[in-house]
Amino acid sequence: RSIKYRLTPRDVEKASPLPTEFINRYLIDDDDLAMDSNIVREAAIEAVGNETNLLRKMYNIRNYVYDKLSYGIKPHIDTPDIVLERGIGSCGEYVGVLLALCRLNGIACRTVGRYKCPPYAEQQGIPLQPDYNHVWLEFYIPGFGWLPMESNPDDVGRDGPHPTRYFM
């Protein structure tokens, strides 16, 4: 089975501010996130609207990205501005967009993963090729810690509502 998180927006209403070291490490553009581009900055504003609750902001950003992008594997990873214009991205490109939008909204986050997986889920006992990596992200809630979030929905249930199972 798996670990399930039962955190609600009410649980984080009184979360402490981010520690300074988190601001300096997890709210910066340290991975070609195009956080200074107009399209990414506008998407960051549009994604959260007037929401102030950290967990609801995270849901809003996730839903925005899941609704704006369709999944597609590419041989290389483009920057979030290009991905938002194109509307199609791999899991790594979804992560880039999510990182940029979260960080611009004051949510500390980081990339996790890069593990190898088979080209088809039912295949086992085969050599894994570098073409099949997977990445997702973790976001930080003061007082609770790092929470994982799936990078993309594989276009399951496109246009939402997106199930909360994507917070692993």
Descriptions of predicted regions:
Residues T52, I82-G89, E93, Q124, ...:
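A short glycine-/small-residue-rich loop at the edge of a beta-strand within enzyme catalytic domains
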